[in-house]
Amino acid sequence: MNSKIKRIIDFSTAFGPSGMEDEVSKLAMEDVKDICEVHDDTMRNTYMRFKQDKEHETTILLDAHADEVGFIVQAIKPNGTIRFLPLGGWDPKNIVSGEVWILNDKGEKISGIVASQPVHFLSEEKRNGKVDFDDLVIDVGATSAHVNMMKHIRFS
């Protein structure tokens, strides 16, 4: 695979919702380590300075955020489905049936699907109304809250 395409894929698929940008930051630092002096600080700012002739140094500021919109686990229901809240601007109707990843407390990614109540179970009002996050859950294939705890999925 073309290295430029691979780089785009790696950065596009890196896990980085707000507050959890470490994977993106590490990827960026690794990507430029041969051409830049790199360090970060306690506020998760990353600094990259081209390795070059200090006498002819030009300073350029590239200001960008590393985080992406995401979700945070709110609760694990007794049936094993997961209630969640948005991090950033989401339209709930656009994520139904979408694949998501949950980062557990061991740093493992658990695959899930955003699910809603089947249309034939909805009231007339809900069927024709807008979708809210309260109407959605994440299904990771667990049959109970205990199973999700065994997967080390926790809520905030």
Predicted regions located by residue number:
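N-terminal hydrophobic/helix-forming segments and targeting peptides
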Residues: 1-156
